[in-house]
């Protein structure tokens, strides 16, 4: 099982405080959906890979649809609001010594809104555990 955990809420924090970028706001919290941001700056994530369920995360081989455009066939969501880890991949069988591929995709989109200038950091911890 592969999980992700955001070290802050919101996940994308502006250095020096203030002006943080809010987590993506899907129609149903913590439920992946097609990326849709209107008049806001938001930060969300998706996943692709061998053991990443496409029913949950969508289907694409790349994180982006084009320059600065999140994939339109992946499903995106916010980080867990309760502070627990988010599962992105799992396998019922043992992987080979080479392992399997899993990629966390991130998107930050501004639609008619400008984020405050400065440096931003998102600390995301990925944890792989044996079932």
What positions do the PLM features span?
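Signature of Gram-negative chaperone-usher
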Residues: 1-131
């Amino acid at each position: 099982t592969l999980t992700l955990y955001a070290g802050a809420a919101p996940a994308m924090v502006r250095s020096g405080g203030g002006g943080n970028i809010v987590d993506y706001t899907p129609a149903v919290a913590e439920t992946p959906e097609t990326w849709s941001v209107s008049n806001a700056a938001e930060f969300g994530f998706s996943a692709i890979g061998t053991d990443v369920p496409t029913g949950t995360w969508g289907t694409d081989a790349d994180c982006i649809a084009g320059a600065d455009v999140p994939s339109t066939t992946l499903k995106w969501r916010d980080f867990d609001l309760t502070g627990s880890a988010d599962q992105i991949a799992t396998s019922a069988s043992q992987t080979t010594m080479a392992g399997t591929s899993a990629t966390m995709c991130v998107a930050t989109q501004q639609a008619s809104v400008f984020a405050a200038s400065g440096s931003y950091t998102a600390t995301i911890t990925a944890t792989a555990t044996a079932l």
